[in-house]
């Protein structure tokens, strides 16, 4: 089980990071507009 988690963790991080980056850009743009 631990081996599977070691493989899944990096994949989850890589799949989540781009979404978080987009959200941060949108928030920054929103703050700039307001």
Curated annotation (Swiss-Prot):
Expressed in basidiocarps. There is a cross-link at residues 11-18 (Cyclopeptide (Leu-Pro)). Keywords: Toxin. Disulfide bonds: none annotated. Processed by the macrocyclase-peptidase enzyme POPB to yield a toxic cyclic octapeptide. POPB first removes 10 residues from the N-terminus. Conformational trapping of the remaining peptide forces the enzyme to release this intermediate rather than proceed to macrocyclization. The enzyme rebinds the remaining peptide in a different conformation and catalyzes macrocyclization of the N-terminal 8 residues. The keyword RNA-binding does not apply. Residues 1-10, 19-34 form a propeptide. InterPro entries: Amanitin/phalloidin. One of its GO terms (molecular function) is toxin activity. Belongs to the MSDIN fungal toxin family. Probable toxin that belongs to the MSDIN-like toxin family responsible for a large number of food poisoning cases and deaths. This is MSDIN-like toxin proprotein 3.
């Amino acid at each position: 089980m631990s081996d599977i988690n070691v493989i899944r963790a990096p994949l989850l991080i890589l799949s989540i990071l781009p979404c978080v980056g987009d959200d941060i850009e949108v928030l920054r743009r929103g703050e700039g507009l307001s």
